[in-house]
Amino acid sequence: MNISKPQQRTLHALAQGGRIELERDDNGRIISADCLTRDGWALTDCTVAVFQSLKRKRLIASQDGGPYRITRLGLANLRAQLDNRVGAKAW
């Protein structure tokens, strides 16, 4: 499955314990998607388009109205990295 770099970054943050919280307008439409790491930092790569793409591919899901988290399918499609914070050139 083809996954773009912003989608990969978002999935890595979710795999490490992060979550996606949505903000909706009065009609129920999504205004913004905020990806928060387990440390509480916001990930700037996570946009509404990235969120919708990950949800469409069923790589993320929400349970009981909670924040969106990575699914088993998302973990299976995630490419392994030594450390998400360090580029390949640093090693």
UniProtKB/Swiss-Prot annotation:
Q: Which InterPro entries match?
A: YjhX_toxin (IPR018654)
Which family is this sequence assigned to? Belongs to the UPF0386 family.
The record's annotation in HAMAP family points to: UPF0386
Q: What is this protein called?
A: UPF0386 protein CCNA_00226
Organism of origin is: Caulobacter vibrioides (strain NA1000 / CB15N)
